Amino acid sequence: MRTRAAFVIGVLLAAPVVSGFSRTLIAAQQPQPAPTPRAAAPVDLTGYWISIVTEDWRWRMVTPPKGDYASVPMTPAARKVADGWDPKRDTAAGEACRAYGAGAIMRVPGRIHITWENDTTLRVDTEAGTQTRLFRFGTAAPAGEPSWQGRSLAQWQISGGRRGAPPAGGSLKVVTTGLRAGYLRKNGVPYSANAIVTEYYNRTNEPNGDTWLVVTTVVEDPVYLNGRFVTSSHFKKAADGSAWKPTPCEAS
């Protein structure tokens, strides 16, 4: 009788432990919510960055003259538009920001400031033209009227790392549609409202401590381009925003 009583008491004492273990096991088997894009970021793109112009000086540092369209795969329709470029007319029409849209803004010299608007949206502010871009993570871009910066859909591209291990690195891909017609260059080289802008943001760390952001931009436009227009823009990370000075759009 004493042995049987001890056995019963042992079972009763062990029951809460077994029950707790079962609850823990069941909870572990339940699907966990996916991390937010902010928490899942394989690379930190936030901070202040200043553009370093190492190429295309004649098209980026000054407004090139009318007719200087070298290296842009323009259609005859695009050339006709560019040949009629008039910066005074653009200013009078309230369209001085034509060269500051998503198709060209990363090529305009100046600083950019990248922050998280919320857990699912990256925000990019530019000194040049005082523009704001919102990169939303998800499966569909939000509806809205065409604008200079359009509607941008973002996704992380993970690289490196073994299966089940944390990512070794990655980059950001951004696809922008819903644009107002703008300029690829300040001298009137156009892109239409049908343009699609695809960008790749890659951060690299140099042995000397410098941190760089390379933005590769691909513009496709069935109206004004007969091929992809590809550029790479380089930004060096700044220590802080003490030199941040936003400026308005200028037509020339």
Spans of features found by a protein language model:
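N-terminal low-hydrophobic presequence detector
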Residues: 1-5, 9
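Bacterial N-terminal signal peptides
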Residues: 8-19, 23
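PEST-like low-complexity, intrinsically disordered acidic/proline/serine-rich tracts
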Residues: 2-3, 25-252
